[in-house]
Structures are given as C-alpha cells and as structure tokens.
Amino acid sequence: MKNVVIFLIKLYQRYISPMKPRSCRFYPTCSQYSIEAISKYGLLKGGIMSIWRILRCNPFNPGGYDPVK
C-alpha cells in the first residue's frame, strides 16, 4: 500500500505539479517531503507527518528548510 501512495504522489509530481504555479514555501517540497516521510516511517506515521506539513504550507507560515527527521 505504501508503494501505491508513493506512486500516486510521483504521478502528481510529474503530471499535475508542472501545470500549477510554484506555491510550496518549504524545501523539500511538500510532495517530496511526503514521499520521504512515508518511505522512512510508513504509511500511517508518514501520512500524518505529510498532512501536518501540507497544513503548515500557507501564507501565514514563513516556510524554509524542513527535512524529514
């Protein structure tokens, strides 16, 4: 299941993300962060980390360097 989710994120990165203006305030991007978090911590914990990261990616947060720890 983990590999299916990562595959779907990679499809998003390849086909949908290039059509949208850059909007992620973080490095690595939220989608790349999600791949790394799910790969390292599994679908449950990595998924929660990904959701929390996406919720923080907004105009009220300065963003910056935020790697998966």
UniProtKB/Swiss-Prot annotation:
Main location: membrane
Record GO cellular component, one term: plasma membrane
Subcellular localization: Cell membrane
Assigned keywords, A-Z: Cell membrane, Membrane
InterPro entries documented for this protein: Membr_insert_effic_factor_YidD
Record's bilayer topology term: Peripheral membrane protein
SS bond list: none
PANTHER family named in the record: MEMBRANE PROTEIN INSERTION EFFICIENCY FACTOR-RELATED (PTHR33383:SF1)
Family: Belongs to the UPF0161 family.
UniProt cross-references to NCBIfam families, sorted A to Z: membrane protein insertion efficiency factor YidD (TIGR00278)
Protein's job: Could be involved in insertion of integral membrane proteins into the membrane.
Annotated protein name in UniProt: Putative membrane protein insertion efficiency factor
